[in-house]
Each structure stands twice: as C-alpha cells, then as structure tokens.
Design a protein with these regions (language model features):
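Short beta-strand/loop segment that forms part of the nucleotide-sugar
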Residues: 33-41, 63-66
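Active-site beta-to-alpha loop of glycosyltransferases that engages the nucleotide-sugar donor
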Residues: 11-25, 41
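Active-site-proximal specificity loops/subdomain of glycosyltransferases
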Residues: 45-92, 100-101
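Cell-envelope/extracellular polymer assembly enzymes that use nucleotide-activated donors
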Residues: 6-8
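Short, acidic, metal-binding catalytic loop of nucleotide-sugar glycosyltransferases
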Residues: 25-34
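Short acidic/polar active-site loop segments enriched in Thr and Asp
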Residues: 33-34, 88, 117
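Conserved donor-nucleotide/metal-binding helix-loop-beta segment in metal-dependent transferases, i.e.
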Residues: 101-127
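Short acidic donor-binding/metal-coordinating loop in glycosyltransferase active sites
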Residues: 40, 94-98
Length: 129
C-alpha cells in the first residue's frame, strides 16, 4: 500500500444535532478525510441544522435514512461500505465516541500498525457526563 491513506467516518444519528460540531472538529483534526452521516429522521434534519448553524458541509455527505426496520444501523453501515469502498478505511463512531491515541493522528496510527485489514478499538468510559 502506498503512503497515501484515505479514511472515511460513518455514523447514523437521530436527534443528536448539538453534538455534531465537536465530533466533526475532533475527527477532522486527527486526519479523517470524509464524513458520511445517515440521518435517521432527526428533527430538525441534520442538513437543516448544519445550514441554520453555518456548519460547513465540505467533505460531508448526509444521507436521509428513514429505515424503521430493526437493524437500521447495520443496514446503514452496509450501505456506507458499499457506496464508499474507494476509501482505504471506513471507521464507525457514534457521536458520543471519540478516537484517542498518543499520536492523535489516525493515519500515523494505521501506518504504525503496518496497515491492518481491520482494527477493533476498545471502549474506555470516563464516568458520568
């Protein structure tokens, strides 16, 4: 693999609009290239919230996802993998989950692990919020 890593971040959210700005800034700062957000009937919609609050949608794709069936998250993530398979990596983090490492650079972390095919990351819970 060449040294150019492309990495996308995918999530599905419903009514979590106030948390997007912090979440996006965190992941942009540590090296993610693209954000794919599945809007599961948020009110207001995520795109409306971004527009009303002047949040940039550069490198962000928002997909209306109104799947009411059980397993909606799994189907959204499968859809993401199929549509965005041109990325070297796709990560899945909810809006209350933040990737942290000593380097705080996800691409450097992947390089240091010799470009793994897959990576599982353990939770660390810091107590009540």
């Amino acid at each position: 693999m060449d040294d150019t890593i492309t990495i996308a971040l995918c999530c599905i959210a419903k009514d979590e609009n106030p948390y997007f700005e912090e979440w996006l800034n965190h992941y942009k700062n540590i090296g993610f290239d693209k954000f794919i957000i599945y809007d599961n009937n948020s009110s207001p919609s995520i795109i409306r919230y971004f527009t009303d609050n002047n949040i940039s949608t550069k490198n962000i794709t928002i997909i209306n996802w109104t799947d009411e069936e059980f397993g909606s998250q799994s189907r959204a993530y499968l859809d993401c993998c199929q549509k965005y398979s041109d990325f070297n990596y796709i990560a899945f983090f909810d809006l209350d989950e933040f990737y942290m490492s000593k380097s705080m650079n996800v691409k450097e972390d992947l390089k240091s692990l010799d470009y793994p095919d897959g990576l599982g990351i353990y939770w660390r819970i810091y107590g009540k919020s």
